[in-house]
Amino acid sequence: MPRKPWQLPAQNTLPYLLLTLTALCGEYPIRQISHLPGGSAYLESVVTALRRDGLLRTFSKDGLRGLRLTSSAKRLLLADAPEWFSAYLTGSSEPNKLKSEIPRRLRLHRMAEILTIMHNADIPAFPWEKAPFSAASQSAAIPAYYTSREVKEIGPQGTKIKSSRATGILLTDGGIFLTYNTAKAQMKWEYKAELRFKALLQTEGVMPDAEISGIVFGSTMEQLSILTQPDAHSYFLLDGSFPHFYYLTNDRYGEAILRLLCDTQQRRTLDVILADGLHEGIPNWRVENDAIDSEGNPVLFAYTCDFPRIRRFDTALELHGMTGTLICFDYQEEALREICGQCVMLQSIDFQQFERSVLYS
């Protein structure tokens, strides 16, 4: 029997973080716990203690397992920080009125996964960490992540994106990213809704001159080949509606690429390293490129896994009867080989060496 909780864990601790993520999403996926900061034994002890103290409970149905707040945890969080949690733990808000249907729960899990990876990448994602979305254009604090729920709160315009599969948007110094999470499943895209979301961002003037791109998260690199297959609902990923769409995995690799997408200067640093020994790229050439090798062949830096750009590179090489080199991280190589033709040669970067020498240096 869980004992009656008298107090919450301290703020700025992992137990409080887990309670916060659960409060904001409604249900936290069990499988995502291993992605929180800390070793497996410590994470297990945190979850065990929160259950024992009557703050979390496990909800399992139809093979899907998640953590939910107890009524005592809601009461304590509301008393501790009402300005943070009132919008989520009172009234008819979805995190406070949870349903048991699989599609609804999966959506909550996908939201939780993205909030976790944003937090791990040091991107402000909780509502109190950044300006409200309606005031984002006046705020200089970027990067910042806004959930689709926060975006919909702008007013009547928010109803235009009701059917979108986006989990939210990421504002960075390099532009705006509509963010999606396909998790382990194949995404059921809503083509018109996604384009309406893009149009809304353009008309609302959040970052008036910013380029709007997309990020889709998945569980493994193997899912990339599914995303790049012709499909009536997902062709907008490759049809030019979004000139850049990045595929990131929901793990430490994806967190690293996310950091790069948020930091233009760090990407430039990596590009300079990769360009060593190569000739300067040719702008507006018949084959998109970042550099030219000693034999005059194009080279593309593909470590961010911008798959429309990779597809354009591959298609142009085949069209013009040329060969070219695609530079990626070692963990991406096998999946990119699967989606590229014979004209593309792959060259990989050691990810662990990149972490040590560039990302956290």
Residue ranges and their predicted role:
Residues 51-62:
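A short, conserved structural fragment
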Residues 36-53:
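Short amphipathic alpha-helical interaction segments
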